[in-house]
From Swiss-Prot:
Organism: Paraburkholderia phymatum (strain DSM 17167 / CIP 108236 / LMG 21445 / STM815)
Domain of life of the source: Bacteria
Leader sequence residues: none
SUPFAM superfamilies for the chain: CbiD-like
HAMAP family membership: CbiD (MF_00787)
EC number(s) on file: 2.1.1.195
The name this protein goes by in its record: Cobalt-precorrin-5B C(1)-methyltransferase
Gene Ontology BP, a term: methylation
Family: Belongs to the CbiD family.
Gene that specifies this protein: cbiD
GO MF term set: cobalt-precorrin-5B C1-methyltransferase activity
Length: 366
């Protein structure tokens, strides 16, 4: 997850997806094989029609062309930081007798080993839109040169296997490296679309592998709490980060039997107030709201409520309430559960768990 930045520039720079990088490098390598021309720059057309020139860091024959050709470009994510920013994405292309394009996982690109994704088990983790982009460009290239054969395309990412450990790929059953992603070809700054897509994939993989109880967690401590509480395997633990809404809305289309949500007390207080994006950039902890919720409990009093309004942090407010016998953690969890119930199908059993900074459960509601 990203740290909050106090000031955002007025205009943020977009970047390009790994799918765009794979397309431009496969096109350049194939063009070298068909024309003998090694390019420094190649232009592709994105799914929405934009023409984009991209620089190449290499474009060369392999073994004088006997082993095909390869081209590489540096992944530029713009002002949207991700694990692949600055990595070299490359394509190795061979000509084939049979028409069409066949895809392979090169070094640093993973292979699908679990059901539930948009790709079949055993396929390279090159998502559908990047496949469509590469196929369209290579088909046009073949027509341009009067070439009737096909292409064998292996996509790789420098250091991709190590980078993949920083993603959800291992949990999704994508082994050996990264996924080649993208739907528009462009990375929008702070759109978080890739992260949200991985949340959806995590739910789909859990369902496809027979897990009807999932736990959506805001971070490592909440995951550890749910793993210990329910002995759930990693495949049933969904790392939602701040995107509670991404989980709840996806369950409308892909429901499970039971959803356990677990997060820090402060983050769950935001969900309880109706916020579905829990990042501090987009929602704030409301101490006055916490004080009002306390007021509904018999053990509460005006002194406690005033102290909560003046608290430095939500954790301090929680400690004050608990000291006075007010189960503020349970109150917040009950309200967060009710918000979630309004979104997911009625058939989904929802429960909430709040933890403190040490990972201890300080509130729950079923």
């Amino acid at each position: 997850m990203r740290d909050e930045t106090p000031e955002q520039p007025a205009l943020l720079r977009s970047g390009y997806t790994t799918g765009s990088c794979a397309t431009v490098t496969s096109l350049a390598a194939a063009r070298l094989l068909l024309s003998g021309i090694a390019s420094d720059v190649a232009e592709i057309v994105l799914p929405k029609g934009q023409h984009v020139p991209m620089k190449l860091v290499f474009c060369r024959l392999l073994n004088d062309g006997k082993d095909g050709a390869e081209a590489g470009t540096i992944k530029d994510a713009g002002d949207d930081p991700d694990v692949t920013h600055g990595a070299i994405v490359f394509a190795r292309v061979r000509l084939a007798d049979a028409p069409g394009v066949r895809f392979h996982a090169g070094p640093g690109v993973g292979t699908v080993t679990r059901a539930g994704l948009t790709l079949a088990v055993g396929e390279p983790a090159i998502n559908p839109v990047p496949r469509q982009m590469m196929t369209a460009h290579l088909t046009d290239l073949a027509a341009e040169y009067g070439y009737a054969g096909g292409f064998e395309v292996a996509i790789g990412v420098e250091n991709g296997e190590a980078l993949a450990q920083k993603t959800m790929n291992p949990r999704l059953g994508i082994v050996g490296g990264l996924s080649i992603l993208g739907t528009t070809g462009i990375v929008r700054p702070f759109s978080c679309s890739a992260y949200i897509a991985s949340i959806h994939q995590g739910i789909d993989v859990a369902r496809a592998n027979g897990y009807r109880h999932i736990a959506a967690c805001t971070g490592n401590a909440s995951e550890d709490a749910m793993r210990a509480y329910y002995q759930l395997p990693d495949i049933a633990l969904i790392e939602m980060g701040d995107f509670a809404g991404a989980v709840l809305k996806h369950l409308k289309r892909a429901p499970v039997d039971k959803l356990s949500m677990c997060g820090g007390f402060g983050k769950l207080s935001k969900l309880a107030a109706g916020h579905l994006d829990l990042h501090s950039r987009n929602s704030s902890i409301d101490l006055r709201q916490l004080a009002q919720w306390c007021a509904s409990h018999a053990a509460s009093n005006a002194t406690l409520q005033a102290a909560i309004v003046g608290a430095n942090t939500s954790q301090e407010a929680l400690a004050m309430a608990l000291k006075e016998g007010v189960p503020l953690g349970d109150i917040v969890c009950a309200r967060a559960r009710d918000v979630a119930r309004e979104i997911v199908p009625a058939s989904v059993e929802v429960e909430m768990f709040a933890i403190d900074r040490q990972g201890n459960i300080v509130g729950e509601a079923r």
